[in-house]
A protein has these predicted regions:
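Conserved N-terminal beta1-alpha1 strand-loop-helix module at the mouth
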Residues: 1-85, 91-93, 100-103, 107-108, ...
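Conserved beta-strand segments that form the floor/walls of ligand-binding pockets within enzyme
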Residues: 3, 107, 111, 132-135, ...
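A short, flexible beta-alpha/helix-coil linker loop
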Residues: 35-36, 136-140
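Short acidic loop-to-helix transition motifs that present clustered carboxylates
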Residues: 115-117
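Short, glycine/charged-rich beta-strand-loop motifs at protein surfaces that mediate ligand recognition
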Residues: 141-146, 170
Length: 173
């Protein structure tokens, strides 16, 4: 099954209600959180997640492109995230981030940048509800798809199939 999770990165936040209404047919809403450290851009944080949660019952897929996801994971769940997706390249121990998100009551995903080997996900795949492969460099919207990321998607699907894992793979970019 394919799920489309429209990003609100380019939304008009002066008309957030209308923007969420425009994507109301989608099952999920993708919220990119950027801190200006892990990626060079800054987007938005807890107040936007909370505002979107008040506007919709859609699944909120919160993608943390931040240096220290462990510090914020529980707060994003309390703000309304259904999924918290962190980057394997962040400063925190992935297993601790996974545990923190689960303990806070949300589902958890792990992401990798285009230049990161897909194999870094293998050790945690059995603990994830979702794996995200970036097909653009994180931090900016409107980039072109990096076709050399396609083999990673296939390799991760093969790994899941060979290990009896039913973990959805999200492609972002």
């Amino acid at each position: 099954m394919n799920i489309i999770s429209p990003s609100i990165l380019a939304a008009d936040f002066g008309n957030l209600n209308k923007e969420i209404e425009r994507i109301s047919e989608a099952q999920w809403v993708h919220i990119d959180v950027m801190d200006g450290h892990f990626v060079p851009n800054i987007s938005f944080g807890l107040p936007i997640v909370s505002a979107v949660r008040k506007l919709t019952a859609q699944v909120l897929d919160v993608h943390l492109m931040i240096s220290n996801p462990l510090t914020y994971a529980e707060r994003f769940v309390k703000a309304g995230a259904d999924f918290v997706v962190f980057h394997m390249e962040s400063d925190d121990d992935p297993k601790e981030v996974i545990r923190a998100v689960r303990n806070a009551g949300a589902k958890v995903g792990a992401a990798i940048k285009p230049g990161t080997p897909v194999e870094v996900l293998y050790d945690v795949m059995d603990s994830l509800d979702l794996a995200l492969i970036m097909t653009v460099e994180p931090g900016f919207g409107g980039q072109s798809f990096l076709y050399d990321t396609e083999p990673k998607i296939r390799a991760l699907r093969t790994f899941c199939n060979e290990n009896g894992l039913n973990v959805p793979i999200q492609v972002d970019g």
